[in-house]
């Protein structure tokens, strides 16, 4: 790819950043489509995020992806949020139109799309959702919008717990889905929730390097063959949770599905063009 002065810059702002496959995926897609953009990763944490957004404007970047730990903070730095992003309270995509910043969240649509592409119908189903960060709440919000009957959200009593309660209130007030929030330390409640669940989704970083030997499911007997287990983590590809799920006879969806479909939507938001899906799946080695 020969980058010229006509090329526009798209970024990814996250910390840590070196594990991300998004730059490789998006640049392969941009090159295949013959579009004058290049995608670069920038190591940005909460402290440096405000300055990074000023830099985005000053450099007239087309936009940026947003990942941990900036997804919720980023909402404060855009001029407009989509209705779904407001419900989530977090964004993973910024589009810059001549200095006017719009915030989107493609994590939820991407993950739910991956579930649907597997042939699973979420309407009327119950999901156990692990975590209350940006990706997790995006999945919950989109699932509620698209027909989940109930979401049982489990999170530790950390800085995200109050945010989880606020998220549940927003979803309960604006959709027909019922959301409850429980401390993950309550293992009896967790076991009871899994027993009646149709879907278990890990929206946390547990399982991602360097936590690849960890899982929030401490007892594999809690997983039953009728359960669909889905991951947001894609590095490593086969997390400990997915290994447990396969041993228990569950159907699984790895983190590549969400990465692919959320990235496809981002690509279109930034470029106005269709994402070369089949090509990217092939060159990236995704089985999604």
UniProtKB/Swiss-Prot annotation:
EC class of the enzyme, as a word: oxidoreductase
Residues bound to substrate: 71, 107
GO molecular function, one term: shikimate 3-dehydrogenase (NAD+) activity
Residues that hold NAD(+) according to the record: 132-135, 155-158, 205, 232-235, 255
Alphabetized InterPro entries for the sequence: Aminoacid_DH-like_N_sf (IPR046346), NAD(P)-bd_dom_sf (IPR036291), Quinate/Shikimate_DH (IPR022872), SDH_C (IPR041121), Shikimate_DH-bd_N (IPR013708), Shikimate_DH_fam (IPR022893)
Keyword Endoplasmic reticulum among record annotations: no
Pfam families according to UniProt: SDH_C, Shikimate_dh_N
Catalytic activity: L-quinate + NAD(+) = 3-dehydroquinate + NADH + H(+); L-quinate + NADP(+) = 3-dehydroquinate + NADPH + H(+); shikimate + NADP(+) = 3-dehydroshikimate + NADPH + H(+); shikimate + NAD(+) = 3-dehydroshikimate + NADH + H(+)
Summary of the function given for this chain in its UniProt record: The actual biological function of YdiB remains unclear, nor is it known whether 3-dehydroshikimate or quinate represents the natural substrate. Catalyzes the reversible NAD-dependent reduction of both 3-dehydroshikimate (DHSA) and 3-dehydroquinate to yield shikimate (SA) and quinate, respectively. It can use both NAD or NADP for catalysis, however it has higher catalytic efficiency with NAD.
Family that this chain belongs to: Belongs to the shikimate dehydrogenase family.
Name this protein carries in UniProt: Quinate/shikimate dehydrogenase
Biological source species: Escherichia coli (strain 55989 / EAEC)
Lineage: Bacteria, Pseudomonadati, Pseudomonadota, Gammaproteobacteria, Enterobacterales
Gene from which this protein is expressed: ydiB
